[in-house]
A protein has these predicted regions:
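Short linear motifs embedded in intrinsically disordered, charge-biased segments
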Residues: 1-164
């Protein structure tokens, strides 16, 4: 509830929803997604982010859950796509950047780092590398395509998460 009290402009009824959407995309969402390209985010964490985002969008639109308006309609009126897709987009952009770097770049060395020894008992933690491979499989892309910067940027832009 504190976010609503502090947000002033975003919850102001005099400002159009379209302008609020632009403000949300340029100020709030980047703060929410800060360094998201490096997160090995789980489905549960992604869901929490989407719930948080929808609560903010509903507050901005002046809509409550009691009004029974679908999330897709609210997203369409504010012109904001799902945050999970934006996180995936930023992860793919960072992956392309990493793939094109030299082999002696520290980020690339860390990505390929294999730690010897035994892991703890239980399910292995999701790694960034695993999440990237999952994203590539989901989209039907190949690792080598990231080496062509123009192609990679078009691919990412074609799968743009935000409606125009």
């Amino acid at each position: 509830m504190n976010w609503r009290k502090l947000s002033g402009v975003l919850c102001d009824k005099k400002i159009s929803v379209k302008k609020k959407g632009r403000l949300y995309k340029t100020v709030v969402r980047p703060a929410l997604m800060y360094s998201a390209e490096t997160w090995p985010i789980t489905k549960a964490e992604e869901r929490k982010m989407e719930v948080t985002e929808m609560r903010m969008l509903r507050w901005m639109s002046g809509v409550t859950r009691m009004d029974r308006i679908r999330n897709e309609y609210i997203r369409g009126s504010v012109k904001v796509g799902p945050i999970g897709k934006k996180i995936q987009e930023s992860r793919m952009r960072w992956f392309g950047h990493l793939e094109r770097r030299d082999e002696d770049y520290i980020g690339k060395q860390i990505e390929k780092l294999e730690i010897r020894g035994r892991r703890k008992r239980g399910r292995p933690k999701k790694r960034w590398k695993d999440k990237v491979n999952e994203d590539l499989r989901e989209k039907g892309w190949r690792r080598g395509e990231a080496l062509d910067r123009g192609l990679w940027r078009r691919r990412i832009k074609d799968g743009n998460a935000d409606p125009i």
